[in-house]
Amino acid sequence: MAKISKFQDKQVEAILNDMIAVLEKHQAPVDLSLVVLGNMVTHLLNSSVGSQQRIVLAKVFSDALMNSVKNSK
């Protein structure tokens, strides 16, 4: 999603590949995959981000997602 990141591409790709493998293992269709990923994002925000920053971070995340989808080829 992000073009500039503080994380190494290798690390991001490794985690992404693991997550894709899990969804494929469960033969999750797109709608179920999106529900699961959305629940994961919600869990991360609620369990790891202070209440003052949750809405701000959720907005930044959703904006980045929208930009990624708009700019995909």
Swiss-Prot record:
InterPro entries: UPF0352, YejL_sf. SUPFAM superfamilies: YejL-like (SSF158651). It holds the Pfam family DUF1414. HAMAP family: UPF0352 (MF_00816). Belongs to the UPF0352 family. This is UPF0352 protein HSM_0097.
